[in-house]
Amino acid sequence: MNLTPTTPVDDDNTEPGPFIELSRESWAVLSDSTEIDIDEATLDHIRGLGDPTSHRDVVEVYRPLTQLIHLYCMHTGALFDASNNFLQLTRHGMKRTPFVIGIAGSVAVGKSTVARLLRELLGRSPRRPVVDLVTTDGFLYPNRVLEERELLSRKGFPESYDRKALLRFVVDVKSGMPEVTAPVYSHVTYDIVPNQQLVVRQPDILIIEGLNVLQPPRRRSSGTMGLALSDFFDFSVYVDAEEADIIRWYINRFLTLRQTAFTDPHSFFGEYARMPDNEAITIAKEIWDTINGPNLVQNVLPTRGRATAILHKGPDHEVRNVWIRKV
């Protein structure tokens, strides 16, 4: 794991730092603390395209992570109750607001699979909480707006999102609004779906997955600092890997999509389905070099140190190390 000096994780662990590093083997031992599990059929449904996440990964990596998040959730609830008692708000019947989890990481690193796995596993934890999942793709500006602003070639960069709408969505959720809506995005048409909305109705846990969810606050024109999405997270996960591995996974996924989603007559990328493999690989590399790669280096990777947990994957897509922020 190549960590820059500015990242608050120590490569050699010889100096005290804000993170605890655990090898996969050490982390897997913690799996015995819970019996939460899923079957192969459910895992098949959850896995992303080309993602080789196995049942062994579920047991050794995601089960301990689920238990850790459950502990955070329980203690957050206890703190909420204690604070209400101290402030004498109990008589007002204030309801606890959703526990919000952010999942960040590069394109093609497998963060969507991690988000879906956690939704399934957390929903099976004690007390059977209601768990919703929202991706930030729905808060991308429609292609029409991106074209008007000459941002279509920067889709996925922070400025391509309606950040005010996304922040308002999370603020409303954390404020206890009974019903909050989010736009819906189609990976087939590569655009926002008109007249469709995802409705979130006070779940116990809300998972928000996206490239830039751990971005720090921006400075307003007045010079004051604004709010960041991550200000409202109770727990966050960064899915990490070496860029060379992510590029390879991205190209392989691109080639697979040519035989699946790209063949849909409504697909925005239909022309790629008819290309020879060598041309498709060239296009995929170009997209990475001009969009996904620069976005990773400039915007996504620098937020890694802001996460509560970092899952670092090896070349085979398996999590090799886990970093947990010290409480």
Swiss-Prot record:
Coiled-coil portions: none
Superkingdom per UniProt: Bacteria
Main location: cytoplasm
Protein's GO biological process: coenzyme A biosynthetic process
One GO cellular component term noted in the UniProt record for this chain: cytoplasm
Record's subcellular location: Cytoplasm
Catalysed reactions, semicolon-separated: (R)-pantothenate + ATP = (R)-4'-phosphopantothenate + ADP + H(+)
Pathway(s) this gene product operates in, as recorded in its UniProt entry: Cofactor biosynthesis; coenzyme A biosynthesis; CoA from (R)-pantothenate: step 1/5
Sequence positions that bind ATP: G105, S106, V107, A108, V109, G110, K111, S112
Keyword field contains Chloroplast: no
GO function term, MF aspect, one: ATP binding
Keywords noted in UniProt: ATP-binding, Coenzyme A biosynthesis, Cytoplasm, Kinase, Nucleotide-binding, Transferase
Enzyme Commission code: 2.7.1.33
Keyword presence, Kinase: yes
Database matches in CDD domains: PanK (cd02025)
Family from the record: Belongs to the prokaryotic pantothenate kinase family.
Protein name: Pantothenate kinase
Provenance organism: Cutibacterium acnes (strain DSM 16379 / KPA171202) (Propionibacterium acnes)
